[in-house]
Amino acid sequence: MNFLKGTLVIDHGKSAFLLTGARSSFPISLENPPDLNSEICLGIRPESVSFEPTGAVNPSSVVFEAGLEIVENLGHESLFHLDLFGQSVKARISSSKPMVASGPGVVRFAFRDMHWFDAKTEKRLSA
C-alpha cells in the first residue's frame, strides 16, 4: 500500500486533505476527524492508482501531476514508480493497457479507493 502524508485542513468550510508538497487540497469526509492541522495519511493500493500522460477532470477521482522514475515490467503487468511531490507512489498497471513509459504525467486515484490513517497513531480513520 502507498502511504502519502498530508494535513487535515479546512477548505471552503469543509474538511480537506492537503498532500505534503501540493498547493491545493481536495475534500474528504471522515466520521470522527482528528484535530484541524493534524497529520494524516492517505493509503491507496498500487492497483488503485493510474498513471496517464494527461488527465481529464473526473469528479469521482483526484488527479495530480507526477514524475515517472522507473517502470518494472513484470510480464502481465508493470509496476510504475512515481514521484508525487517528493513522495514515492507505486502504480500497478496491466500490460494490456497501452502506456507511454517515460516522462511526466498524472497520477489518479478514485475517492472510493482511498483509506485514511492518523499519522501519529497509525490507526485507520473511518470515512
Functional labels for PLM-detected ranges:
Residues 1-12:
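ABC transporter nucleotide-binding domain
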Residues 5, 42, 74:
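Short glycine-rich loop/turn motifs that provide flexible caps or phosphate-binding loops at active sites
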Residues 11-70, 88, 98-127:
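Glycine/charge-rich catalytic "coupling/switch" loops of P-loop NTPases
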Residues 13-17, 75-81:
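Short aromatic-glycine-enriched beta-strand elements
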Residues 84-85:
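Short acidic, flexible loop segments centered on an aromatic residue
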Residues 91-94:
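A conserved acidic, glycine/proline-rich C-terminal tail/linker
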